[in-house]
Structure formats: C-alpha cells, structure tokens
C-alpha cells in the first residue's frame, strides 16, 4: 500500500450538509430551520439560560456565599497511602509515586489508614490525627512553608522597595 491508495473507511467522513438547495434535497426552502420565528432568522440566538422573557432561574434564586480569591487549594494524601513509600516523603516524592498531581498550592496529609514504617514526612500541612499516626510508627513530621501566592510576592516586593528607600 502506498500513500496514494490511502482512503478513510466507509462511514468515517460524513457528507457536508448543503441546505437551501431545492426541495429534492430534503433541506430546501426553510433549510431545516422550520417555520418563522426567532430561531428561523439569521443573526444571534438568545443567550443560554434565556426563558422567553420570564425571570430566569439564575436570577430567581438568591445569591449566597463568596469566592475567596486568596484560598489555598491543597492536595490531599491519606496516611495509609504513604505505606508503600520509604525514607523522606516530600511533594516531589508524592508526585513521582502518583499520589498527587503537583498543580495546587501544597500538600496536606490526612488521617486515614495505617502506617507501619518510619517515615520523615515533609508537607505543607498535616492534621493532628495524621501526625499522631506517623509519630506512632516511629516517623517524624516537618512542615514546609507554603509556596507564595502572586499576591504575597507582590506584597513582599512592595515592602522591600519601601524599605530600600
């Protein structure tokens, strides 16, 4: 077989839908849009969530809560998940083991499961139950500072610039 003989399998490519080209095509006259009305006209359609002028659901329901832009999203790891690891357990080791993705603001270890081997766990946050389980197994916990957010970096730079004057 050569390049000039390559062909898509039957049914892989759908024929182009040619509308408004006579009654015989099945898509003539109104071109598959039905009769008159807003949806038959050219131009923009109404927006998603539009209910024909009726007060839409997203405006009928009350607003509540707020979104904290400074919130830290931590990746969670249970103590039982650390069982297969050895030595020093840090975010890089957890990522290589496939326990975290490494695209959040840090790692938190939660209580859950048993731990039999002594580990040195270096994470951003640890719950009291998880700390007790790690220390009971003969390990130790070291907290590492959370990576700075862009807001914190800007604030620190501004403070340093003010002190330099």
From Swiss-Prot:
- Identify the GO cellular component terms for this protein: cytosolic large ribosomal subunit
Keyword annotations for this protein?
Ribonucleoprotein, Ribosomal protein, RNA-binding, rRNA-binding
For this UniProt entry, the molecular function terms from Gene Ontology, in alphabetical order, are: rRNA binding; structural constituent of ribosome
Pfam families xref list: Ribosomal_L27A
Q: Which Gene3D superfamilies match?
A: 3.100.10.10
Q: Name the Gene Ontology biological process terms.
A: translation
Residue numbers spanned by region Disordered: 1-44
| Keyword Transmembrane helix among record annotations | no
Q: What does this protein do?
A: Binds to the 23S rRNA.
Q: What is this protein called?
A: Large ribosomal subunit protein uL15
Species of the source: Anaeromyxobacter dehalogenans (strain 2CP-C)
